[in-house]
């Protein structure tokens, strides 16, 4: 894993519920490799059981080489009846822990189609950050991913 640094590569962490502590140890052991946690670390949104996930996310976010993709939240909720309000506690927590500088919006497409349509997920994510500044929203929905993955910008400044 540490050889990724030599090639300027990063690593996306696709975990199962309960594996955030293992990822945290990997991130700790590879301080010069950037890691993107997918699906906000797979909290139990459906049952509104966010502990110990909250503490695990805070511990992971303490490492500056750890980033978090705000994806998969709808698929972690009740597929039939989720509302944006159901997702907000988990989404707010990752933004609180990682900040906008290290949190990137992700679609989780096509998997998210099992829980919702793409426009509904985008609306829920936008709703979750409705009180944030334009600069913070731009960071979340564009800049963090551009910077992390080395993509060409698609938004004008």
Outline where the language-model segments fall.
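Catalytic pocket-lining loop regions of alpha/beta-barrel enzymes
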Residues: 1-104, 152-157
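Short, active-site-adjacent cap segments at secondary-structure transitions
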Residues: 75-76, 111-113
